[in-house]
């Protein structure tokens, strides 16, 4: 399959939480499973109806750091994988080297 991504993705497993702008409710737990300069892959642990196109706010908690990395983006794809949902988020900004290093 042809991989058309502009940026290389780094595999990871980082605790995170997300909030959907369009939905009423609080933060939900998730795991960031990969990261690139312009996107992240997320494993949603409590599957619910999350429509493609949703604006998503993320706080990612790198190991051994006190402050989370805050990211904002749009959900571009979502699919079922076992009991979880796996989503792809296109970030609103290209990550600088510092943020990418904290996440990778």
Model-predicted regions and their roles:
Residues 2-5, 40-46:
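Short alpha-helix capping/helix-loop boundary micro-motifs
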């Amino acid at each position: 399959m042809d991989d058309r991504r502009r940026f290389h993705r780094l595999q990871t497993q980082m605790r995170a939480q997300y909030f959907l702008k369009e939905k009423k409710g609080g933060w939900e737990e998730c795991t960031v499973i990969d990261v690139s300069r312009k996107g992240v892959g997320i494993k949603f642990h409590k599957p619910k109806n999350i429509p493609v196109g949703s604006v998503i706010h993320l706080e990612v908690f790198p190991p051994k750091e006190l402050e989370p990395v805050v990211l904002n983006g749009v959900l571009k794809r979502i699919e079922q994988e076992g009991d979880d949902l796996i989503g792809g988020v296109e970030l609103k900004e290209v990550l600088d080297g510092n943020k990418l290093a904290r996440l990778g």
